[in-house]
Amino acid sequence: MKKLMAANWKMYKTAGEARTTAASLAALTADTLPDDREVVIFPQFTALSPVADALRHATGYSVGGQDVYPAAEGAYTGEISPGMLMDCGCAWVLTGHSERRHVIGESDELVGAKTAFSINAGLKVVLCIGETIEEREAGRLGEVLERQLETGLAGVKGDAVPAAIAVAYEPVWAIGTGKVAGPPEIVEAHALVRQLLVARFGEGGVAVRILYGGSVKPENAREIIALDNVDGVLVGGASLQADSFSRIILA
């Protein structure tokens, strides 16, 4: 199973800046990318085509959208469809990121609709789940992960697993705060996610990649990736510079 190393560039970088960073990243790892690594870059929408173009000859790299709407087309101002993402060179899309849930107010049901529609349209999905500090302190970790995972995958058929889906566990309290869940917390959460995936998909759930996404940096990436049931990382701030993210990819 290849480790999935994903970069979420959020609302940063112009199209030109994103293209330059992607090209630099590919150059830094051109001769050193291990066979057990797969890299996905999630730039903002206007940078999708430039980044895809910069990576078109980069082995092991692909591009994804940060969001999607569950419709092929229509009167949905400001939205983007799976087909439009693929037209820009995307193979992946993020659904359920904590900033979409907590800043934009997306419901579990909308996340599930986006996930299923995207997979049916031909995209692969990184479904993000995770708890707030209030939920963790209230002892609701298992409840929250089960709800988000069950609703997020409600429309996903078993034959789509594991190739078309990955799950990113992102403790909300550790995103952009500089706080990092310790190894025991990461292992606990990822074990719960694995149990839920196996309960939902049987043997297929064993092979679904589970990523960790909470303030991953070059300094802690190797330790995190070595933990049980950690099959990659979803990186925010530390992925914005090619040198930093290349060190994480090669950790």
Swiss-Prot record:
Entry's Gene Ontology BP terms: gluconeogenesis; glyceraldehyde-3-phosphate biosynthetic process; glycerol catabolic process; glycolytic process
Cellular component terms per the entry's GO annotation: cytosol
Enzyme superclass (EC): isomerase
Catalytic activity: D-glyceraldehyde 3-phosphate = dihydroxyacetone phosphate
This protein's UniProt keywords: Cytoplasm, Gluconeogenesis, Glycolysis, Isomerase
Cellular location(s): Cytoplasm
Residues of the signal peptide: none
Pathway the protein acts in: Carbohydrate biosynthesis; gluconeogenesis; Carbohydrate degradation; glycolysis; D-glyceraldehyde 3-phosphate from glycerone phosphate: step 1/1
GO terms of molecular function: triose-phosphate isomerase activity
Catalytic-site annotation from UniProt: H97 (electrophile), E170 (proton acceptor)
Enzyme Commission code(s) on record: 5.3.1.1
Superkingdom of this protein's organism: Bacteria
PROSITE patterns associated with the record: TIM_1, TIM_2
Residues that coordinate or bind substrate: N8, W9, K10, G176, S215, G236, G237
Record's function text: Involved in the gluconeogenesis. Catalyzes stereospecifically the conversion of dihydroxyacetone phosphate (DHAP) to D-glyceraldehyde-3-phosphate (G3P).
Family of this protein: Belongs to the triosephosphate isomerase family.
Binding partners and assembly: Homodimer.
Name of protein: Triosephosphate isomerase
